[in-house]
Amino acid sequence: MSDLKKAAQQAINLMDLTTLNDDDTDQKVIDLCHKAKTPAGDTAAICIYPRFIPIARKTLNEIGGDDIKIATVTNFPHGNDDIAIAVLETRAAVAYGADEVDVVFPYRALMAGNETVGFELVKACKEACGDEAILKVIIESGVLADPALIRKASELSIDAGADFIKTSTGKVAVNATLEAAEIMMTVISEKNTKVGFKPAGGVKDAAAAAEFLGVAARLLGDDWATPATFRFGASSLLTNLLHTLELGDAPKGPQGY
């Protein structure tokens, strides 16, 4: 198997197959669940809005997808600095049955000089997850832009108990970049290598996935990236990867997240 095909295979098994659109419906989520069981094996998770968790759980159980985790989003997509609302949303997501919660860090507050609210919000949401769900923290690196802010948001999130740090919501102009990945995984290497990393949005094909996996291997070791420590947040990426593996047709039309 070529290096590109190896990267494609690995990326599928590390994928949070995502639909976070305003026009999502039960049927779109059912279809997503079926897509998550690919000819190259299951994706690690699906990522959906909280209201769709029950139908996703029912569908995955029916199709033998019990091992596919259900991730959802809170404080999404704007990363507001109201801790109480973020906690209520996170508790509700866990009550719905989420295995994983992707919460948006209050990145605009950090840009305005407030480091405390981000730490406290992540800490409170981690407590709200309890033992029921893992917490991924979206720092919106494309808006933070400044390497020092990307580093600070990563450090605060890890110090507050994040299980993963994630680049992006996929709802802004700049999503996952190799530059942000380098900073974020450097912080992981310095602080706690059990914390995972999730690039989201903008990873379009096997070659791009291989670049992100290459940064992980260089900074954290060849065997570090597993579903417990690395995820790709993506929707259109799956079609490209299956095409690379000669298990699906080439993608048609404009490619989303």
Curated annotation (Swiss-Prot):
SMART domains: DeoC. It comes from the Bacteria. Its EC number is 4.1.2.4. Signal peptide: none annotated. SUPFAM superfamilies: Aldolase (SSF51569). It is found in: Cytoplasm. InterPro entries: Aldolase_TIM, DeoC, DeoC/FbaB/LacD_aldolase, DeoC_typeII. It catalyses: 2-deoxy-D-ribose 5-phosphate = D-glyceraldehyde 3-phosphate + acetaldehyde. GO terms for molecular function: deoxyribose-phosphate aldolase activity. Pfam families: DeoC (PF01791). The active site is at D102 (proton donor/acceptor), K166 (schiff-base intermediate with acetaldehyde), K198 (proton donor/acceptor). GO terms for cellular component: cytoplasm. One of its GO terms (biological process) is 2-deoxyribose 1-phosphate catabolic process. Keywords: Cytoplasm, Lyase, Schiff base. Pathway: Carbohydrate degradation; 2-deoxy-D-ribose 1-phosphate degradation; D-glyceraldehyde 3-phosphate and acetaldehyde from 2-deoxy-alpha-D-ribose 1-phosphate: step 2/2. Belongs to the DeoC/FbaB aldolase family. DeoC type 2 subfamily. HAMAP family: DeoC_type2 (MF_00592). NCBIfam families: deoC. Catalyzes a reversible aldol reaction between acetaldehyde and D-glyceraldehyde 3-phosphate to generate 2-deoxy-D-ribose 5-phosphate. PANTHER family: DEOXYRIBOSE-PHOSPHATE ALDOLASE. This is Deoxyribose-phosphate aldolase. It comes from Shewanella piezotolerans (strain WP3 / JCM 13877). The lineage of its organism: Bacteria, Pseudomonadati, Pseudomonadota, Gammaproteobacteria, Alteromonadales. The gene is deoC.
